[in-house]
């Protein structure tokens, strides 16, 4: 977040890095960052520095601009070769436990439905999920570790024959109908803002952020990933800096409530269907979403193994990878697939 002077120009900056935990870092002005709490938009903006390739940056900026225009994300004020200037939104991130709070839960369902209804100028073939997982798998199989606990956990992961397991998962999901929609692909509490001043309102109090993984993908993955995130708390202040509780995975009743809200928003004429037909659509989504939740565990498990090797952020990435693969096999057993 950067302070602006009265003419809208940036102040002189002394940039330092502030690690934020699971996914990355923010940059702040060492001289003036504490003043941020005293100013309001549009007196301050958020500067996003992008370290990825130019093509990816252009695509993400186009996506960001469209989402901002449709009020599904922060406003876009400008772009430059290595990043962009975004609206600073006075807010706080949700906590893990808030994901299941009924009013918040309902609005998240509405936001996801609107997101999935977007028509974006990108390739609509659902290549992102397994294309990315195959790339991650290739990287994982080439990794080496020297730290003893990393070696021990990595050896255990390799004993699962992950390439064969991924092929099995791919076959399962190819036989599982799931509409291709524009997905966020990283729906977790840290990417959902509760807007200041709207905490006690019934609607329009939330905003989705962080669209770096967004693409056309299977609906089941986006919702399944969101359900998986109910079980992970990334605010724990001791190593490995997260807590897993798979018992917090949404119950069937909670999932069916979510599907009801989702289908009311997305399925034309859903409210006019018979109760039996509505139930059938929700039962189909139950199978779809929980099977794709397996892909969420597998995807972020592979991602986290790579982060254990390359990331400088203080987080137990290898432990997180183990937690995700443990949850994968636990859910697979429960689903009997």
Task: Name these PLM-found stretches.
Residues 64-67, 76, 86, 115, ...:
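Structural signal for hydrophobic/aromatic residues that build the beta-strand cores
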Residues 104-108, 153-165, 258, 314-328:
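Extended, well-ordered alpha-helical scaffold segments
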Residues 221-274, 294-312, 327:
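Active-site activation/catalytic loop segments of kinase-like enzymes and analogous catalytic loops
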Residues 3-13, 17, 21-28, 32-37, ...:
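Active-site acidic catalytic loop and adjacent metal/ATP-binding pocket
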Residues 20-37, 43-161, 168, 172-179, ...:
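ATP-binding pocket architecture of kinase catalytic cores
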């Amino acid at each position: 977040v950067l302070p602006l002077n009265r003419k809208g120009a940036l102040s002189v900056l002394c940039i330092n890095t502030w690690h934020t935990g699971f996914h990355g870092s923010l940059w702040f002005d060492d001289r003036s960052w504490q003043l941020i709490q005293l100013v309001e938009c549009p007196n301050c903006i958020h500067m996003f520095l992008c370290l990825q390739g130019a093509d990816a940056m252009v695509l993400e900026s186009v996506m960001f601009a469209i989402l901002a225009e449709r009020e599904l994300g922060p406003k876009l004020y400008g772009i430059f070769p290595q990043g962009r200037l975004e609206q600073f939104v006075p807010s706080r991130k949700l906590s893990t436990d808030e994901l299941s709070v009924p009013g918040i839960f309902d609005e998240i369902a509405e936001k996801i439905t609107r997101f999935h209804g977007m028509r974006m100028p990108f390739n609509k073939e659902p290549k992102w999920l397994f294309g990315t997982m195959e790339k991650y798998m290739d990287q994982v199989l080439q990794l080496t570790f020297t730290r003893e606990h990393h070696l021990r956990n990595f050896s255990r992961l390799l004993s699962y024959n992950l390439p064969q397991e991924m092929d099995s998962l791919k076959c399962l999901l190819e036989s599982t109908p799931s509409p291709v929609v524009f997905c966020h692909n990283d729906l977790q509490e840290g990417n959902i803002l509760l807007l200041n001043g709207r905490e006690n309102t019934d609607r329009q109090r939330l905003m989705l952020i962080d669209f770096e993984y967004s693409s056309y993908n299977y609906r089941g993955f986006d919702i399944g990933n969101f359900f998986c995130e109910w079980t992970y708390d990334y605010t724990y202040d001791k190593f490995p800096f997260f807590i897993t509780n798979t018992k917090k995975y949404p119950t069937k009743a909670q999932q069916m409530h979510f599907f009801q809200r989702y289908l009311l928003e997305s399925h034309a004429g859903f409210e006019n269907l018979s109760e039996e037909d509505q139930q059938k659509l929700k039962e189909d989504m139950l199978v779809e979403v929980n099977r794709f939740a397996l892909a969420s565990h597998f995807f972020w498990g592979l991602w986290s193994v790579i982060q254990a090797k390359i990331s400088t952020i203080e987080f137990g990435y290898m432990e997180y990878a183990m937690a995700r693969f443990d949850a994968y096999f636990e859910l697979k057993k429960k689903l009997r697939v």
